[in-house]
From Swiss-Prot:
SUPFAM superfamilies: S-adenosyl-L-methionine-dependent methyltransferases (SSF53335). The keyword Flavoprotein does not apply. Belongs to the N(4)/N(6)-methyltransferase family. N(4) subfamily. It is an enzyme of class 2 (transferase). This is Type II methyltransferase M.BglII. Residues 316-341 are annotated as: Disordered. Its EC number is 2.1.1.113. The keyword S-adenosyl-L-methionine applies. One of its GO terms (biological process) is methylation. Keywords: DNA-binding, Methyltransferase, Restriction system, S-adenosyl-L-methionine, Transferase. PANTHER family: RNA METHYLASE-RELATED, TRNA (GUANINE(10)-N2)-METHYLTRANSFERASE HOMOLOG.
Length: 360
């Protein structure tokens, strides 16, 4: 990354003059030099440099013992010990009003046994005296192919708070009512809307589409989560100018969301290539070869600059020989819920039980 590109990134993030002009509402306990930065190195080293009670939200998706350790797979107990040490530090730096969202999947051991990690992580948070708020199920329309088991189509997000007094804002994350105009038909409220006009609580089953090769946010990172899912978490548990920490920030999804929602971010990523790409996404600019890390960054750049024909640019996940199209956009959660419902209805209509009934 060139010096000019780095200056452009700093300008985009309001990081000029080494953060000397940051607003004075930032808590003095949090080092200003860390705000809106991605630490390239071990996450424990980053965490040890953060003061107690200085972060408003911790949200992350730790490596599930794959990809990050190359060919050096850790035994489950060793992996959990390492994660416990990280979580202890996250608890220490979290403000009393703060939340931790820890997205976990499944650990597959050498014999092929699938162990859901949420049941192993729950006691870790509980041992720190944290308060469980939700076990969120993230359902995806599509999962990995499987021949000897049911295909996995969900992961879990554990939400814990440090104290019983925590931040939570429902209105910014409400979703449309199923029957938006439904009214009370009797009683004192007859004729009034039966539901909240702002929408309903989204519940603890989320249907955000997983980031894959046909998703506009897709980069070279193997386990990327969608921005709209992190947006829901940030909006519901923080306020503008709060500090969001991601100890495994990867390609900077959490950083992008925090920046777009006027929050400060800090995170760690051990892979230098991922850090460079994260900063490029944050800058919204092409590299020296007119390439973007993903389709979304390219589309936003063209929309911002009034570019109709993007043929002079490329993006990393672009298919060979194809021209970039600006039409592809990520669908909202409601779209994916509809996909899931339609799939369930299709399976019900074509079930073996239904066929047997029809034959009788």
């Amino acid at each position: 990354m060139s010096e000019d590109q780095y200056k452009q990134i700093k300008l985009h993030l309001g990081m000029e003059d080494d953060n000397e002009d940051l607003p004075n509402h930032i808590p003095s306990s949090f080092p200003k030099q860390h705000l809106n930065k991605i630490y390239n190195g071990d996450t424990m080293n980053m965490l040890l440099d953060i003061p107690d009670n200085s972060v408003d939200l911790v949200v992350t998706s730790p490596p599930y013992n794959i990809n990050k350790f190359k060919n050096d797979r850790r035994p489950l107990e060793e992996y959990l010990k390492w994660q416990t040490e990280i979580i202890e530090q996250c608890h220490r730096v979290l403000k009393p009003s703060g939340s931790i969202f820890w997205q976990v999947g499944t650990y597959v051991n050498d014999s092929g046994a699938h162990i859901p990690l949420d049941i192993r992580f729950f006691p870790i948070f509980e041992s720190l005296g944290m308060f469980p708020r939700n076990r969120i199920v993230w359902v995806r329309p599509h999962g990995l192919h499987a021949n000897k088991k049911f295909a996995g189509r969900h992961e879990t997000i554990l939400w814990f708070t440090k104290t019983p007094e925590y931040k939570f804002f429902l209105d910014p994350i409400r979703v449309p009512q199923k029957y938006a105009n439904k009214k009370h038909y009797k009683g004192d409220k007859k004729g009034e809307l039966s539901g909240d006009p702002l929408g309903k609580n989204p519940g603890d089953v989320w249907a955000f589409r997983n980031v894959r090769h046909n998703h506009e946010e897709d980069t070279i990172h193997p386990t990327q989560y969608p921005e709209d899912m992190i947006e829901r978490i940030v909006l519901s548990t923080t306020e503008p100018n709060d500090i969001v920490l991601d100890p495994f920030i990867g390609m900077g999804t959490t950083a992008s969301v925090a920046k777009n929602l006027n929050r400060y971010f800090y995170g760690a990523e051990i892979e230098k290539e991922y850090v460079d790409i994260a900063y490029q996404i944050l800058s919204g600019e092409p590299d020296e070869n007119n390439n973007f890390p993903n389709l979304k960054t390219l589309r936003q750049y063209c929309e911002k600059n009034g570019i109709i024909d993007p043929s002079q640019y490329t993006f990393t996940r672009q298919r060979k020989g194809s021209k970039p199209s600006l039409d592809s956009k990520a669908h909202p959660e409601e779209h994916h819920k509809k996909e899931i419902v339609e799939r369930i209805e299709f399976e019900a209509e074509n079930s073996v039980y239904k066929k047997v009934q029809n034959e009788q």
